Design a protein with these regions (language model features):
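Interdomain motor-coupling "hinge/lid" segment immediately C-terminal to the ATP-binding subdomain
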Residues: 4-5, 10-130
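Accessory nucleic acid-recognition modules appended to NTPase machines
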Residues: 82-227
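Conserved Walker B catalytic segment
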Residues: 1
Length: 227
């Protein structure tokens, strides 16, 4: 099992012959159900599914269910971050772990693009989403020279699985690839917890009080993009 971002892995094995017995599996951050399992909770998700299937409201349990969902959005599904939260129950310390992960990703982005364009595009995801524009506006992040020959950089970013691309399509039916416009896209961080940390990247660390306010839904910051 090879761990790390796919950028590092591909760089490290690019000259190694891959045996035919190798089976490649894609690993993703924990989803909400897996996160609840890590929290020792195997009952909530089946219960939510029952209510959804029956199309009935949660009632008094809704507030706790939303708080648990916000906790997942803040911690995210990266195993190191989840372990830190389980060990410390401290969102600020968990944030420090997520910052280390993001720093590794930024280092990897600089490996594939030494001009720093990939890293800059990644760092600008929160601000671009906050503009509520129809697509990622590369022109507001990179100058004219930086926007030249960008398709290869974007392809490497997509292959890294650190970011997710959502492409515009005029006819989003079967055969989506026939109608998608790869010049018209939005870019998202692949993990909600990393997105929250990246949104507060201007601070040396995200204070525990900020996390607590986000968790209790009392901070004015728009959580819509985390959803």
């Amino acid at each position: 099992i090879e761990t790390g971002s796919l950028i590092s892995i591909k760089k490290n094995v690019e000259n190694i012959l891959i045996p035919s017995e190798e089976t490649r599996l894609d690993l993703y951050p924990m989803d909400y159900e897996e996160f609840r399992w890590a929290m020792g909770d195997t009952a909530t998700f089946p219960l939510l599914k029952q209510f959804l299937d029956a199309k009935v409201p949660l009632g008094a349990a809704h507030r706790e269910a939303m708080r648990n969902l916000r906790l997942y959005m803040l911690v995210g599904g990266m195993p190191q971050a989840v372990n830190e939260y389980l060990d410390t129950n401290n969102l600020s310390k968990t944030d420090a772990v997520k910052r280390e992960i993001i720093e590794l990703y930024l280092d990897d982005f600089r490996k594939i693009d030494k001009t720093g364009r990939a890293a800059k595009l990644f760092e600008s995801i929160p601000s671009e989403l906050n503009k509520n524009s129809a697509r990622y506006q590369v022109a507001s992040v990179l100058d004219d020279a930086g926007r030249k020959n960008l398709m290869g950089v974007l392809a490497d970013m997509k292959d890294s699985m650190v970011v997710n691309f959502a492409y515009h399509a005029n006819d989003p039916n079967v055969g989506f690839s026939l109608h998608s416009d790869e010049d018209y896209y939005k870019m998202f961080v692949g993990d909600t917890g990393l997105f929250v940390t990246l949104a507060f990247w201007d601070k040396d660390y995200t204070e525990n009080t900020i996390y607590e306010k986000l968790l209790s839904d009392k901070l004015s910051s728009d959580m819509g993009y985390a959803y």
